[in-house]
């Protein structure tokens, strides 16, 4: 540095002068030779008190310089005075007492806190008074708002009663709030928005709970208060309530008042009110006014609902031209949805494909599908409604609708309309025209071809033309392999041919394509039932019952399967569910009676058989059981009415009239029994049983006709015997050929010998009454002699007071018949 000179030596100011000069106190090389320093290191002599135990804080107030610090001088080992000490009793300046940011608290070991956060929040300037009126008003207002919110939440959750209670509570507290606010502040400070929300919520909850009078009163309070702005709109709500009450004139009045108070800038709200007015006009039958309302809506803001209602109104007045124009307006309503091509990937870009897959079934796409389905439903319904009336014939009307649809954005609906045209032909029982219409689709695209072939297959199936049905079912399946209806029809044709296993496979495939195809599920249950796979059949019908909870057919099938599985208790339980759905089904009631009868519960069986008889008094099996029940319970006179009805239903069956006569005889009305037997003999002169009873009654009563009837009886029995011999000989000679000629009395009484009593012969006749193979038989009918044997035992013989001796029955067989009585 001595050889480098950046400025002339003659310069008076040397920039580097004194650079090499330094205080000898900083010379660390001489510390080893410094006696004072070494002594201070080895001992505590001259050591300064520790002041770095904690970081000093700047948040403590600055100490006063005078008379507060230490008065002694602290000297370092080098003899240099310590910073901040007072030397020789001379007071130093105040700014030199301590370093900036430090305080006396540092000497006590406090933490460094320059922002003063350890002291906490600043104390309030004034203590909070919770009992002040303003604070009470604020708390009460907060509580009212909470109650209104809770009321709305309860309403959205479906708890209407709780919502109304919360709304009432909010109304009560709001009135208290208004009174307190009036006492504390001026009336201008009242919270009108809170009052409006409380009253409006209360009226809404009243309306939701169908308390319409209270709701109207609350709305009136709001509407009449001029301080509420836009309260006139609530007249729409009042009109809705009057509409629910069917007070249509007042509803229209309030709708129009609301329409007058709503400015024209609120176009959407005005359109909705006009739509309500149009619907109210329809309900009152004022179709012309309704047409005007809907036409105005269609000119301002066309919509599907307004267009459909316009068509209905025009149809009601029968105006063909207006119906056509309204249909065209409905077709022209814009759907405002994206085309299906948007959801088809134009390239192999994975990012684009992923995006399309994400939006293919999102909420917007679902909404578009629903809107399109609703539009198609409205158009199809309107076309089916007006097609038969807009032209001279429904076929011409359908053709006009099809042409209009083809020229619109709903081109695919034209084929559906054609199929509906075929169905209309079917309703008119014009089978050939329906078939011709459906055959037109054989050259169309696969979807339409499959639908048409499915209908044709079903039509031929109903006509029992199973070959044609199978052919068109194959065509439908080939056109659309995933058409569950086509597969079901194919299964039906196979089922009709008796191939149940193959039919089950078609039904299974239909269910794989559409698990909600109830027809296939029902048919597969029937198929399993035919195959005697009852567990699988029951499983199918139980699945179907989960889908169709109130289907009588499904309930009946489940009950029948349990009956086949010999579980009568379960069968009874399901039949009880069935009659809860169709309480007037006589077959279900009679089946319940049969099951209870098989279980031995006669009283329950009688109850359900009697209910079945009330709903269908022409069921012979039920009549037969009821008659046998009354005979079994020894009320023969009550059984008469049932057997008389049976004789009216089957007048050629002699057994019912014999039962009536037998009931008269057992009830002690012998004269009526005699008259009945005579009437039976007049209608059926060759009936042996009737003649036997006539002989018996005439003998008991002592009438002179006994010989006449006895002679006829002998002749009939002899003829019957000769006929049987002739039949037997003919059978022996011809190898068992049977004769077709039979007596009207039947062969059941001819097997008795002459020694048998008349009661035994009658018992044998009556045992056939409740046949053993009938579905509605009484469980004990095989042992009950319903007409011929008295359940209490043989009748007591009448006293023999007649002068004439009784003729023994066995004498009939001992007498010889003349040649004139023998058959030719």
Swiss-Prot record:
Q: Give me the TPR repeat coordinates as residue ranges.
A: 196-229, 232-265, 271-304, 415-448, 450-483, 484-517, 518-551, 552-585, 586-619, 620-653, 654-687
What residue spans carry the Basic and acidic residues bias annotation? 721-731, 797-808
| One Pfam family linked to the record | TPR_6
Identify the tissues in which this protein is expressed: Testis.
When the coding gene is removed by deletion, what phenotypic consequences does the entry describe?
A: Cilia absent or reduced, virtually no cilia of the normal 5 uM mean length. Conditional knockdown in preadipocytes results in loss of cilia. Mutant mice show a significant reduction of gonadal white adipose tissue and total fat mass associated with reduced serum LEP levels.
Specify residue ranges for compositional bias: Polar residues. Answer: 748-757
What this protein is reported to do is described as: Positively regulates primary cilium biogenesis. Also involved in autophagy since it is required for trafficking of ATG16L and the expansion of the autophagic compartment.
Subunit-structure text: Component of the IFT complex B, at least composed of IFT20, IFT22, IFT25, IFT27, IFT46, IFT52, TRAF3IP1/IFT54, IFT57, IFT74, IFT80, IFT81, and IFT88. Interacts with IFT20, IFT22, IFT25, IFT27, IFT52, TRAF3IP1, IFT74, IFT80 and IFT81. Interacts with IFT172. Interacts with IFT57. Interacts with IFT46. Interacts with IFT70B. Interacts with C2CD3. Interacts with ENTR1 (via N-terminus). Interacts with LRRC56. Interacts with DZIP1. Interacts with CCDC38. Interacts with CCDC146. Interacts with CFAP53.
Protein name, entry field = Intraflagellar transport protein 88 homolog
Q: Which organism is it from?
A: Mus musculus
Upper classification of the organism: Eukaryota, Metazoa, Chordata, Craniata, Vertebrata
């Amino acid at each position: 540095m001595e050889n480098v000179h950046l400025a002339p030596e003659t310069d008076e100011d040397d920039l580097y002068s004194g650079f090499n000069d330094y205080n000898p106190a900083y010379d660390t090389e001489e510390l080893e030779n410094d006696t004072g320093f070494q002594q201070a290191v080895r001992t505590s002599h001259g050591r300064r008190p520790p002041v770095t135990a904690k970081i000093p804080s700047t948040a403590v107030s600055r100490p006063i310089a005078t008379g507060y610090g230490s008065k002694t001088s602290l000297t370092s080992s080098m003899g240099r005075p310590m910073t901040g000490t007072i030397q020789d009793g001379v007071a130093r300046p105040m700014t030199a007492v301590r370093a900036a940011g430090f305080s006396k608290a540092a000497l006590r070991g406090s933490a460094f806190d320059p922002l003063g956060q350890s002291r906490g929040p600043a104390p309030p300037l004034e203590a909070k008074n919770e009992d002040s009126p303003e604070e009470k008003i604020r708390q009460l207002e907060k509580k009212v708002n909470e109650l209104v919110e809770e009321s709305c939440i309860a309403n959205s959750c479906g708890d209407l009663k709780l919502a109304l209670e919360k709304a009432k509570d909010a109304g009560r507290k709001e009135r208290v709030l208004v009174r307190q606010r009036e006492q504390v502040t001026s009336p201008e400070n009242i919270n009108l928005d809170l009052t409006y929300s409380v009253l409006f919520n209360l009226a809404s909850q009243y309306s939701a709970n169908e308390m319409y009078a209270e709701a109207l009163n609350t709305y009136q309070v709001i509407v009449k208060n001029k301080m509420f702005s836009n309260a006139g709109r609530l007249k729409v709500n009042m009109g809705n309530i009057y509409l629910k009450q069917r007070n249509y004139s007042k509803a229209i009045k309030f709708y129009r008042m609301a329409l007058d108070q709503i400015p024209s800038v609120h176009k959407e709200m005005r359109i909705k009110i006009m739509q309500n007015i149009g619907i109210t006009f329809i309900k009152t039958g004022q179709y012309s006014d309704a047409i005007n309302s809907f036409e105005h809506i269609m000119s301002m803001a066309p919509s599907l609902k307004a267009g459909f209602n316009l068509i209905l109104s025009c149809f009601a007045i029968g105006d063909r031209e207006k119906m056509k124009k309204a249909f065209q307006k409905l077709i022209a309503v814009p759907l405002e949805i994206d085309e299906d091509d948007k959801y088809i990937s134009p390239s192999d870009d994975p990012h684009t494909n992923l995006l399309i897959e994400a939006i293919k079934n999102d909420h917007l796409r679902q909404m578009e599908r629903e809107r399109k389905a609703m539009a198609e439903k409205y158009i199809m319904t309107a076309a089916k409604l007006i097609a038969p009336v807009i032209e001279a014939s429904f076929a011409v009307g359908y053709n006009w609708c099809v042409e209009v649809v083809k020229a619109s954005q709903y081109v695919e609906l034209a084929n559906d309309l054609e199929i509906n045209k075929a169905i209309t032909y079917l309703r008119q029982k014009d089978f050939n025209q329906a078939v011709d219409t459906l055959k037109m689709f054989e050259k169309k695209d696969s979807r339409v071809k499959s639908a048409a072939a499915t209908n044709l297959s079903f039509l031929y199936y109903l006509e029992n033309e199973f070959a044609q049905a199978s052919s068109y079912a194959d065509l439908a399946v080939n056109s659309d392999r995933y058409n569950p209806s086509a597969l079901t029809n194919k299964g039906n044709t196979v089922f009709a041919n008796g191939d149940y296993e193959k039919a089950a496979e078609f039904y299974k495939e239909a269910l794989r394509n559409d698990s909600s195809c109830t027809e296939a599920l029902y048919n597969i249950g029937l198929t399993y039932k035919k195959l005697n796979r009852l567990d699988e059949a029951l499983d199918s019908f139980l699945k179907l019952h989960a889908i169709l909870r109130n289907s009588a057919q499904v309930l009946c099938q489940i009950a029948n399967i349990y009956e086949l599985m010999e579980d009568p208790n379960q069968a009874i339980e399901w039949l009880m569910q069935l009659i809860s759905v169709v309480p007037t089904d006589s077959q279900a009631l009679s089946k319940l009676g049969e099951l209870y009868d098989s279980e031995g519960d006669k009283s329950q069986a009688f109850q359900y058989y009697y209910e079945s008889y009330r709903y269908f008094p022409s069921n012979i099996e039920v009549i037969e059981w009821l008659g046998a029940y009354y005979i079994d319970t020894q009320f023969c006179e009550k059984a008469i009415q049932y057997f008389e009805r049976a004789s009216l239903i089957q007048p050629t069956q002699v057994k019912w009239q014999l039962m009536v006569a037998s009931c008269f005889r057992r009830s002690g009305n012998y004269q009526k029994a005699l008259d009945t037997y005579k009437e039976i003999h007049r209608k059926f002169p060759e009936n042996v049983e009737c003649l036997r009873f006539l002989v018996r009654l005439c003998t008991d009563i002592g009438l002179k006709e006994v010989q006449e009837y006895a002679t006829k009886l002998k002749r009939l029995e002899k003829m019957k015997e000769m006929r049987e011999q002739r039949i037997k000989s003919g059978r022996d000679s011809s190898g068992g050929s049977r004769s077709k000629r039979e007596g009207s009395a039947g062969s059941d009484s001819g097997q008795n010998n002459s020694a048998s009593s008349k009661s035994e012969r009658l018992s044998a006749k009556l045992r056939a009454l409740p046949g053993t193979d009938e579905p509605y038989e009484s469980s004990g009918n095989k042992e009950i002699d319903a007409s011929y044997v008295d359940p209490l035992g043989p009748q007591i013989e009448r006293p023999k007071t007649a002068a004439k001796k009784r003729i023994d029955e066995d004498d009939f067989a001992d007498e010889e018949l003349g040649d004139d009585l023998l058959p030719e």
